């Protein structure tokens, strides 16, 4: 097995004694949050540490890097190549080529493993905590981007059906900012995210923290930066090991467990909401006259 050369770590260890306390704070943050730094600008790092972007750049240069771009290129080599979704699909279909049973087993085994993990005491306790938070929420916001954005939209509809107002947070750029502006104190955030500390997730967490909104994280990366900041972490395996495609049905499985649990803890609210939806639906059928 080839040993990775940790250029950044080696330089930090050899030069830490030469850094001022402020520069050492920046250098240590980068070392402890490497994945997040890959997605951050100097100004964003500075904002986290309550310092200036010039201080961030000086700290990076003090360790022998030309700047933030040079640092990121070095960290990227340390992390290794990123496996794209097309490469994951290629690995999966090549493994399962011309074997329908193997494809069926791949999905079934992935879901069976997730069911076993979700039923473990630790996850049951985490889901109970999540349900307790959601039952008292003013509104629930469901965060997910990419394929998880579709789950966020669907889940928000399910929560609304049982009488708990819900909104999806599933856009990027200014679109996500427009969704985030609707958050208020008393809300609860349900977040679907993995290891990559992307800007959308970081911004959403910062806004939730500013408003005192608790976060429920559904993830397979229980050691991620998001996991450290969440109020409740539910471990949801996705079956994407060895470069294969991840399964999104496993996340939906967990979401439906949570929604049904919330509905059962507030039965009167759930029944009242469902009855009202049916009444409104009847009024929308052809031939119905408005009063």
Model regions: which residues?
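Alpha-helical scaffold segments in soluble metabolic enzymes
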Residues: 7, 11, 25-29, 58, ...
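Glycine-rich phosphate-binding loops that contact phosphosugars or nucleotide phosphates
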Residues: 135-253, 259-266
């Amino acid at each position: 097995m080839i040993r990775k050369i940790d250029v950044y770590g080696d330089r930090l260890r050899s030069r830490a004694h030469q850094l001022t306390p402020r520069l050492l704070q920046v250098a240590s943050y980068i070392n402890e949050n490497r994945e997040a730094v890959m997605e951050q600008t100097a100004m964003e790092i500075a904002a986290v540490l309550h310092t200036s972007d010039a201080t961030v750049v000086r700290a990076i240069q003090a360790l022998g890097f030309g700047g933030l771009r040079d640092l990121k290129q070095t960290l990227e080599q340390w992390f290794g190549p990123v496996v794209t979704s097309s490469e994951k699909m290629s690995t999966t279909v090549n493994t399962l080529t011309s074997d329908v049973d193997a494809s069926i087993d791949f999905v079934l085994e992935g879901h069976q493993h997730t069911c076993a993990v979700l039923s473990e005491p630790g996850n049951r306790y985490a889901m109970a905590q999540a349900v307790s938070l959601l039952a008292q929420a003013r509104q629930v916001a469901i965060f997910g981007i990419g394929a998880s954005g579709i789950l966020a939209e669907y889940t928000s509809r399910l929560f609304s059906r049982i009488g708990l107002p819900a909104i999806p947070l599933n856009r990027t750029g200014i679109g996500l900012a427009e969704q985030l502006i609707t958050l208020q104190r008393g809300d609860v955030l349900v977040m679907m995210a993995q290891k990559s500390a992307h800007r959308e997730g970081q911004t959403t967490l910062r806004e939730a923290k500013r408003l005192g909104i608790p976060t429920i994280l559904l993830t397979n990366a229980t050691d991620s930066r998001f996991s450290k900041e969440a109020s409740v972490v539910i471990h949801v395996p996705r079956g994407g090991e060895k470069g294969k495609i991840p399964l999104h049905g496993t996340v939906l499985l967990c979401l439906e467990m949570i929604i049904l649990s919330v509905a059962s803890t507030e039965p009167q609210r759930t029944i009242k909401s469902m009855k009202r939806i049916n009444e409104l639906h009847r009024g929308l059928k052809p031939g119905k006259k408005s009063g």
